[in-house]
Curated annotation (Swiss-Prot):
Matching PANTHER family: GLUTATHIONE S-TRANSFERASE THETA-1, PTHR43917
Reaction(s) this enzyme catalyzes, per UniProt: RX + glutathione = an S-substituted glutathione + a halide anion + H(+)
Record's protein name: Glutathione S-transferase theta-1
One of the record's GO molecular function terms: alkylhalidase activity
E.C. number: 2.5.1.18
A GO CC term attached to the entry: cytosol
Keyword Transferase in record: yes
Species this chain originates from: Mus musculus
BP-aspect Gene Ontology terms: dichloromethane metabolic process; DNA modification; glutathione metabolic process; response to salicylic acid; response to selenium ion; response to vitamin E
Distribution of this protein across tissues and organs: In liver, highest expression found in central vein limiting plate hepatocytes. Also expressed in interlobular bile duct epithelial cells. In lung, expressed in club cells and ciliated cells of the bronchiolar epithelium and in type II alveolar cells of the lung parenchyma.
Pfam family, one: GST_N
Residue stretches making up the GST N-terminal domain: 2-82
Subcellular location: Cytoplasm; Nucleus
Length: 240
């Protein structure tokens, strides 16, 4: 049976999975679950993922619903090149270290930056107090500095000389605030150079394809009242 991926490329972990599968020629059928239409909250999607979140994966009768678990499953099943998730114990531990940190580090601040800068005022019609936005962007800059100083340092990629899952997960997170108009790479020259290397390693066409939705997010139409009422509680819980 064909591998099935339930994705919305508005979502940063969905973009990571999409790029990884495409780059490694993993055959899959994509089901687009449009978050801005609340499709992830439907009863039909709940049968795929009871937590009503994307991404989700079905491989025959086997289902996974967490992005890192999906990436590791694909890396193991399809025997992708070693640099993505190295066999070397310490190199693999470095990938694991980044993946463990990013959930409560970079992801939270990137998500909040996008929602506070664009999605609340443009999509949901809710203005964010300037002091809240300023605090969010300050938190983002702190985590960018951690990414640069702790994880990247002076290496070409986060783990060493080659791209890994850590880089892919990190760059798709950073494209959230980039899509929101945040000058993410200003003042972070090592991150700016790393971004260029990651884009080249992935392939510019694939990178742009995966990020087309997020780079146009500022132009999204406002949500209707019903969708806003459905989404607001989950959005507020997500960005706390």
């Amino acid at each position: 049976m064909v591998l099935e991926l339930y994705l919305d490329l508005l979502s940063q972990p969905c973009r990571a999975i999409y790029i990884f599968a495409k780059k490694n020629n993993i055959p899959f059928q994509m089901h687009t679950v449009e978050l801005r239409k609340g499709e992830h909250l439907s009863d039909a999607f709940a049968r795929v993922n009871p937590m009503k979140r994307v991404p989700a994966m079905m491989d025959g009768g086997f289902t996974l619903c967490e992005s890192v678990a999906i990436l590791l499953y694909l890396a193991h099943k399809y025997k992708v090149p070693d640099h993505w998730y190295p066999q070397d114990l310490q190199a693999r531990a470095r990938v694991d270290e980044y993946l463990a940190w990013q959930h409560t580090g970079l992801r939270r601040s990137c998500l909040r930056a996008l929602w506070h800068k664009v999605m609340f005022p443009v999509f949901l019609g809710e203005q964010i107090p300037p002091e809240t936005l300023a605090a969010t962007l300050a938190e983002l800059d702190v985590n960018l500095q951690v990414l640069e100083d702790k994880f990247l340092q002076d290496k070409d990629f986060l783990v060493g000389p080659h791209i890994s899952l850590a880089d892919l997960v990190a760059i798709t997170e950073l494209m959230h605030p980039v899509g929101g108009g945040c000058p993410v790479f200003e003042g972070h020259p090592r991150l700016a150079a790393w971004y260029q290397r990651v884009e080249a390693a992935v392939g510019k066409d694939l990178f742009r394809e995966a990020h087309e939705v997020i780079l146009k997010v500022k132009d999204c139409p406002p949500a209707d009242l019903i969708i806003k009422q459905k989404l607001m509680p989950r959005v507020l819980a997500m960005i706390q």
